[in-house]
Amino acid sequence: MKLFIINPGSTSTKVALFDDDEEIWSETQRYDTDVISKFKSIGSQEEFRFNEICKILKEKGVSPQEFDAIVGRGGLLRPIKGGTYEINRKMIEELLSSQFGSHASNLGAPLAARFAEAGGGKARSFIVDPVVVDELVDEARISGLPEIERRSIFHALNQKAVARRGAAKMGKTVQDCNFIVAHMGGGVSVGAHEKGRVIDVSNGLDGEGPMSPERSGALPAGKLLSLCFSGKYTRQEIESKLVGNGGLVAHLGTNDLIEVEKRITNGDSRALLIFKALCYQVEKEI
């Protein structure tokens, strides 16, 4: 079975072709921020990214008619259980409207549906374990204020895939195991997996958990309040400090850990301190 996979990121799109479990090829397109910034919304990037992916297929000599199934990265939908979901019009409308948040992952389902259509409708299109997977136990939803309920937004696809892989290595299924799984990318999320369900997880998009290359993580609430009411920043600027321009970007001006390691090797004591702090915070969350 030929499976075409589409993973849109903020400034990139990764695509891959699989024959069952075997990867045939994969490619990552990277876009200049100047190009992406010209689009007024995530949804308005759909046509651009579709055409760019078509260029890869042309280079590979592959037609969408060859695909049996197409899987797009799941975006910010209403909370749902983990699993595989077939893409439909309502899902696409919800994602493109950014009703539950704006993120490049919202383009995964629309792009998958576009390529299914381009292939003449032979292939079915799906998303798997989107970032809004919500399997929290009731206690995990409670914060210290009744007006604020915790929500589940995390790297569900990666976390659940790693849990399945770990269980398989032990000759078990995830239903037989309990894990703590840490995803460490531009954002960091740490989840408690109980027999296949993620019953609690740090929500890096809402400012929980450890800092990461691009996110602030949890901050002292009092000092954050002072920053918010200082009159120096708009709401959008504060949000940018929490997600996108926090963490390593805020401290060191880069989200590239390879660059940070080079600085440490060259004797940059500040880079070493911040790197140790990031590791410490992830360890503490685990």
What spans do the regions from the language model cover?
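Short glycine-aspartate micro-motif
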Residues: 2-6, 67-71, 179-183, 189
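Phosphate/pyrophosphate-binding loops at sites that engage ATP/ADP/AMP, CoA/4′-phosphopantetheine
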Residues: 55-68, 168-173, 286
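Glycine-rich phosphate-binding loop of actin/hexokinase-like ATP-binding domains
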Residues: 140-230
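Adenine-nucleotide phosphate-binding core of ATP-dependent small-molecule kinases
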Residues: 240-286
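Gly/Ser/Thr-rich active-site cleft segment
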Residues: 100-162
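N-terminal phosphate-binding loop and adjacent alpha-helix
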Residues: 27-65, 91, 95-101
